[in-house]
Structures are given as structure tokens and as C-alpha cells.
Amino acid sequence: MAPLRRLANLGLDLAFPATCAGCQREGEPLCAACRPALDVRLGLPGGTPIGLPAEIPIPLLQLDWCAPFTGTVRTALHDLKYAGERRLANPLGAAVARRWARIGVGADIVVPVPIHADRERRRGYDQAALIAEVAARDLRLPFVCALERGRATVAQFELGRDDRAANVEGAFRVRGRGTGNTGGTGPSPGPSPSLNPSPSPNPVRGRWVLLVDDVVTTGSTLAACATALIQAGALAVSGIAVARER
């Protein structure tokens, strides 16, 4: 699949030259001058960016993020999610990998926070899965779509802080079988290491999971995912997002 993905991305670049989400110059989906917006926290120590240690949702060992949900970062995430600009998954996923590698905490597998299957069919892809696949590739970790949404939920941005946890409580479950790809034409130039040569009945048991999402606000969605993973036998769960919205 990797050669086909490279050809597909090359064809896309030739037919529709990328325009930078930050400065609108043609050439790259996020140019070299605008990419530093993704790394504003790169030199900071790992910790508890949502607030005090007690504010981390209990199922998560750690929660981190790359940049504030403002300016260039906000535009890039919006264009990936709503404008079909899949090429942005490459710089966004690479930023996630850089941040996680810098704080040096570790993980065994990378798992994306899934959108509901109906929404993925309408959009044509899952933006968090595209980001997570690139991050897994750069971290040289297995990429596993281990979670699914068992029910549709209201978009978190439409809810207040107090309603977000209730909205996603019990919404996620671990898939019966693991997979090494998103099921679509992702942006990565090569495959991430596979978890096993054949599907596993429980891809998370005994493993430290790194959850990847596009945006985190209260951490409720990541916490709900972590709960499902821990109940399925995951050893520990950490979370990271491209951006944090306050």
C-alpha cells in the first residue's frame, strides 16, 4: 500500500498544489516558516498541561499537547478536518512525534481517538487516525486502530465543560481485532511497524498505549477512551493532542 499512497499523494500535489495553511503561499500544506507554530511547547518539560496534577483525568497516566489551538495551528486542524486537506496530517503528526520524543515518557503502541463510523463515511477519513499514523511512523511504534465509537455523540465543542464527560461516557470500546492501518489512503510514505503479523484478539492487553487526538479541551474524550483501554487490559494509557483549546 505504501507505493500506492506515495503515488496518490504525488498525483494530488501535481493536480492541486498545496497552499500553506499559515501564510497561504503555494508549495507545501504548512511551510517551513509556519511549522514552528506547532513546536511552541517543544522545549518544555512533560507534565500536566491541563492544570494541576489532580486535574488530569484519572485513567490517563499523562496528558500533553503541542501548541495552543490558535492561529496557524487552528487553521491547519480546521483544513484537515473540514476542508479535505489530508496532506496536513504529515506536519501535524510529525509535531506530535517530536513532542512525545522530547518528553521521553515512552509507549508501546499508538492508538487514535476514533470518530463515529457514520461521520468517517461522510468525511471520507478520520483526521485523528491520519495524524496518529504519521506520529507512529516517526516514533517507530506500532499504529493500531484499537478503538471504535459504539454510539454517536454530540460534537464536544457544542457542549459546556460540565456536559462533555457525560457526552462521551461509555461511548468507546476496544475492537475485537487489531489493525495496522486506517482502512483508507493515509498520508504516510511508508507503513508503521505492525503490531503482529496477524490480527490480535486484544491488541492492547499488557501494553502502554499512547492515545492521539487532534484537539483537547477538558480531556473528557481522552479519558473515556483510556477507561475503555484500561478495562480491556491496557497496562497504562497516556494521551497527546496536536493542540489544546482553552
Regions found by a protein language model. Name each.
Residues 1-246:
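Glycine-rich phosphate/pyrophosphate-handling loop used in enzymes and phosphotransfer proteins
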